[in-house]
Amino acid sequence: MNAPGPQRMVRPRGVHLPVTGPWPGDHGRLRSGGHGSRVFTTHESSEPLLRGTDPEQVHRIERPNARAADRPLIYAHRGSSAAFPELTRSAYVQAILDGADGVECDVQLTRDGHLVLHHDAQLGRTSNGTGPVSQHTLEQLRALDFISWKAVPIPESHGRRHEQLLTLDELLDLLESVGRTLGLAVETKHPSAFGQGLEEAVLVLLMRRGWDPDTGWLGNIKVSVMSFHPDGVRYFLQSVSPRHVCQLVADTTVSTVRHSMRVGPAAAVVYRAGMKLVVPPAVPIITNGEVELAGPGIQYVRDHPRDVLAWRSNGSVLRVWTVDSFADTHVCLSLGVQQITTNVPAQVLGWVADASAGVPTRHEAQFA
């Protein structure tokens, strides 16, 4: 069953907008001037983006990552989710403060057709709710507590309690208000009660806001879409350039599912059963060149380095997840991975900077 929604805005084919300026792995960013161009602006609301932040923090937010072209881009997995509750406003504000080049999010559709940031199909792991997300309205979800499970205080600068659950629209508002270029990787979660209506809802929202699926740019945000589900990926490919579509892949052992999805053993068994139906046909989508973004998990990279190197040699951009240790960061650097997704972006940025500068680090003992 497909989710009801407005007719997707159809972008005329063959229209190429002028681009200039560097972004790793692409031709550049849209500038002002000419039809369809956009001007990058900072937040214009009288309400400060980050309440209570000091001037140095604000400077860090507004300063572009000038040397990003010299290193992998670092994406914050569900925001800075080691520090704050995953997929909440606080996690994304912290990711911005940490200097992440981009952020990653998972989306689910509510009963009344809103795209909310939530990883699991069921409520409960990260909230005091129960039942499927798809059977709740946005208003019902707003009434739930999505932060207490993490047991960390939320600074005033990171949003009020009732602001923590985000829709995709609200995340885009947050990212657009930041005075620098940011990447956004949007993952659709399956199985979904709405089928490919989930992908359609993502496309409708992005195009309504002015996203260009050829260049990937939406103002200051470089947007890409991704899924483990091959049908979801191929649905995106009907409208989006392969440069901005990522096929996610992973070996589906119970251990790797538990680690990557941060769930208990019983849930891992259920997730693994579903993923085994999806992953085998997913790999050829990368090897056949249907997409240009390859999204293997770090354990897949360790277990299949020849495959990963072959993808890179064939022109794929590697987006590896979830990289939270110095050892895994080193593996990515040694293989020439272009994008790293992590729960600890500040730490990974530091490790990458040290590696680029040839600075010895105490973490090298982890290679044993």
Predicted regions and their residues:
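Phosphate-group recognition and catalysis centered on beta-loop-alpha active-site segments
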Residues: 2-368
